[in-house]
Amino acid sequence: MGPAPRILELFYDVLSPYSWLGFEVLCRYQHLWNIKLQLRPTLIAGIMKDSGNQPPAMVPRKGQYIFKEIPLLKQFFQVPLNIPKDFFGETVKKGSINAMRFLTTVSMEQPEMLEKVSREIWMRVWSRDEDITEYQSILAAAVKAGMSTAQAQHFLEKISTQQVKNKLIENTDAACKYGAFGLPTTVAHVDGKTYMLFGSDRLELLAYLLGEKWMGPVPPTANARL
């Protein structure tokens, strides 16, 4: 019997394109490395407020840089990223609270669907420039991910409950206590120690901490590796 898998907590918000990149890479490696990946829906607005930080898009020069960087990241990570036409306006203004509460509900009620539903919501906002704030938009993403319409509607009815709100706050507070100042934030529990890593470009360092092999953002499949 081999060593127990190391726990990795990924704190993310679908409003963050860099969260999507980190999410996809960790999902690719979860069957290649000896890890147990825990997805934790989080509110980036709460982390920014708690840390006193600003989203990169809100800093003019960083915003200009993002427009140049995203097309390169799309190719490098092989994730279909496209900047929404009005991201700095309506997309940011509307936020992601309904989507993140829905994902929190999924994590509580049907966690095996969390990866797929999270991905479909990212696909809407960060690939197809579609809404993620209206209930029907979230429902469409959940159904596309493979959830039944009835189940998705049931979960939508729960997003305004105090239990779900508290869980999302709990996740956000946990990220802040680890020292998060943005997303994605990955927390690795290795040999009794805890390491907090920020961003989608720290995953090679994560591999080093885990004692695992880094094979780039798009590693071979488990079968190919064997």
Swiss-Prot record:
EC number, UniProt record: 2.5.1.18
UniProt GO BP: epithelial cell differentiation; glutathione metabolic process
GO molecular function, a single term: glutathione peroxidase activity
Origin superkingdom: Eukaryota
Post-translational changes noted in the entry: Acetylation of Lys-93 is observed in liver mitochondria from fasted mice but not from fed mice.
Catalytic reactions of this protein: RX + glutathione = an S-substituted glutathione + a halide anion + H(+)
Name of this protein: Glutathione S-transferase kappa 1
Organism: Mus musculus (Mouse)
